[in-house]
From Swiss-Prot:
Encoding gene per record: thrB
Biochemical pathway: Amino-acid biosynthesis; L-threonine biosynthesis; L-threonine from L-aspartate: step 4/5
Lineage top rank: taxon: Bacteria
InterPro entries: Aminoglycoside_PTrfase, Homoserine_kinase_II, Kinase-like_dom_sf, Pseudomonas-type_ThrB
Name of protein: Homoserine kinase
Family designation: Belongs to the pseudomonas-type ThrB family.
Pfam families reported for this sequence: APH
Enzyme Commission number(s) from the entry: 2.7.1.39
Listed GO MF terms: ATP binding; homoserine kinase activity
Organism: Rhodopseudomonas palustris (strain BisB18)
Amino acid sequence: MAVYTDVAAEELAEFLRGYDIGELLSYKGIAEGVENSNYLLHTSKGSFILTLYEKRVASEDLPYFLTLMSHLAERGIRCPQPEKNRGGAVFGTLMGRPAAIINFLEGVWPRRPNVAQCAAVGEGLARLHLAGQDFPLRRANPLSVGGWRALFEQSAAGADPLQHGLHALLHAELDYLEHAWPKQLPDGVIHADLFPDNAFFLGDTLSGIIDFPFACNDILAYDVAICLNAWCFEPDHSFNVTKARAFLGGYGRERPLTTSEEDALPLLARGAALRFLLTRLVDSLNVPAGALVRPKDPLEYARKLRFHQSVDSIRDYGVTASGVVA
């Protein structure tokens, strides 16, 4: 979450008159995150999240995200629900941006996830994948392997000034992944951005999964790889095999990986690392003046990419090919 677009009180009040969520008492921007503008609303009927969708979210994709959240919730996945306005629509326009209001979920996101939380998010991700199997809408992933070349071209000039040799690393890895990317793995609905700040906990219990604007249809194990990167490294960028074992074990208890998925996981983890390295690099070079946003460090994902380049098999992530402790 973040704030790129400042919302004037008068325009917000006019927008909220279209909803039955009570009288606005206060609102404030949420600085965490990097993609969309988010505000916490307090009204006479409770707390809500207002999201203005920014650069990487097209208004024509909003029915997919918002309908998906309702679909998942109906199947037991704890995720936000969009509020319909008085006309029955789940989104409108505010400050020239597509905007939606969702209900507020209780919980806090873990600043430093522990082993139990890694296991819980693995289970939660697998349940999300299973719950999405009968979702009728489809959306291609614009930030999968087919979209990385354009991101590289947008950011290439800024690579070596950030770190000597980064341009060569990106170029070589992109060439390799475009050639080697798997095409026959199980696919379906994925979250595609399940970082710790998009998972709420009450203690070690997963209380909610939020922030669905990158949800799409893609390789299920690619979503696993994204989480492996997001949840299983320490602040010093070292890989925590205990957390990885817990995460993969939690996932496998709900949806065991196929042999093909297990074999492909190191490659998918490289791809996931490259994806976030590229988007972070693009974002770091294009922060709007005055935006309430904290750009994420691209080099964090350069380190993760180099780690995954050294991985031979899923055993290096703490499990054997049969999904048990290595």
